[in-house]
Structures are given as structure tokens and as C-alpha cells.
């Protein structure tokens, strides 16, 4: 408060009333006093400017301090929100039980983007046949996992319509719901497209799950169309930003793309291992009866306007918030 008191003391001193004795004061004395008052006014103006400047500096410093505290609180809350396992993945992922269960490693690698297969190839480059189909088959048994009602809400789904593990059959209690890893469904779809693409490969007869000898069957084409669509949506949703370089090669007048780009990847093997170690018995799942009190949706092939209660093309929910639209043609299994 010292600058304020000093300012007001100066103000009172410079503006104190000084009566003039007109009878005795000479012109020179009056002129001197007038100049003295002018100097006092100039000094007061300077001190007023300094005072205002100090006020603005003080306000600026105060605002900067408040801004710093606010930013610090926001950063701290953000760090706390994504603290724990998979802190780097959570901001770009919808909640999943596996994010809480294990730390999913990430690593840097160079993808094998060569046009011609290398000697040691992945199952995607193997010659189509029974052995190759068997390698793909390990991904076709999509395992099922247990989550709670609260977890279903975090997924943005309605627990009243999601399949539960019947306690009489499974013995998991009343708060046990069924989920499966979406990435495994994507690999299944890729395998479906692989079989369709190579169905006329010399000597190849597709085997394994979801193999239909009648390639013109309507449901098969619907299945393939679904797989193309779901893979495209996933590619677009997870659109990577890496770039491809180009090169000149002998005997070609057009650029040759180098698809072997450097990538940062999630460890799929860690996810696959978790799926195997934390799933219910697959055989028992296949033999599972429909519980008497199960929620049963109308058959999608009989109601083309909606599927599982959602208008087609209207899947735009927010995490943890259930849709407001009512379920259509809902019923309980009797």
C-alpha cells in the first residue's frame, strides 16, 4: 500500500490551498508562485502516470498468476484422467477392459510392403491351401470375456439389452456380461475376403469356419459386403499419417512406391495372448442355451430399417451416454 499512500500524500501537498496577500505580493512573487504550481502540477501528472503504470503491471502479473494456476490445474486433471496403464492409448481409444487389465506395449518397426513376397512370409502371403487356412483358423474362434454392468455403460451400450452370462449355466453371478475384442472380428473379416479373393486359385478349396461352397448365396455376399464396409470404416477411423516415398526402378517409366514405411505399432501379440488367457470356455459358449429371461431382438433380416434397435446409419453415441431413442419391437425370450 506504500505507493498508494505516497501518491495521495503528494496529491494533498500539491493541492493544498495557499491564500495570496494581494496587497503585499509583487508581480515577481506571483509569477514565482505560479511557476511553482505549474511545476507541482507537472510532477503530479508524472506521478499519476507512474501510478497508473504500476497498477497495470500489478494487474498483468495477477492475471498471469491466475492463468498459470488454471493451466496447471487443467494439465494436472488431464494427467490424472489418463494415469495408469496405457496412458498414451487412452486419449485415442474408447474405453476397453483390456486397457485396465494389461499394459499394451508399443514398438517401432518397418512394415514389409514389398510387392514380391520375401522367403519368410506371413500367413497373408502363404499359398492358399489347407495349411494356410489352418493358420488363419486360430483367429476365427473369437473369444468371449466377462465385464460388469458398469463396464457396459462405459461402452455406451444398454445393459438391459446386452447378453449376460446366465448364472444357472455359467455360475458367474448376476453382474456378468459378454464382450468380444473387435480386432479379432476385423481379422475374421479379412480372412473372409482372402477366401473370396482366392476361391478360384488352382487347387484351392476354402476350408474352416464361415466357408460356403455356394459363392452365389445371397447371405454370403451380404457377409462379404459387411466385411468390406467394416474394414474400410476401421481404416478410416484409425487413419495413419505416415507417408510413402517413391523411387525409380529399371525397366519402368512410372514411379515405384516404397510401401515399407516406418510405423509405431501396438503389440498385437500381447492383445491376442490376453484374449486367450482371459476368455470363457469356447466349447461351453457354443453349447450355451438362450436363458428364459433373455432380451431378444427381432431378426435383422426381417427388419431392414434398423438392427439391434438402431436406425441404420445413426450410430453416433457419446461414451457412457445411452441413446435416447426407444428400442423397436423389443421382447423378452420366453
UniProtKB/Swiss-Prot annotation:
Glycosylation sites: 112, 214
Motif HXXHC 2 location, chain numbering: 223-227
Keywords: Glycoprotein, Membrane, Oxidoreductase, Transmembrane, Transmembrane helix
TM stretches of this protein: 55-75
Pathway listed: Secondary metabolite biosynthesis
Compartments, as annotated in UniProt: Membrane
Traits of the deletion mutant: Abolishes the production of asperipin-2a.
UniProt GO cellular component terms: membrane
UniProt-listed Enzyme Commission number(s): 1.-.-.-
Protein name: UstYa family oxidase aprY
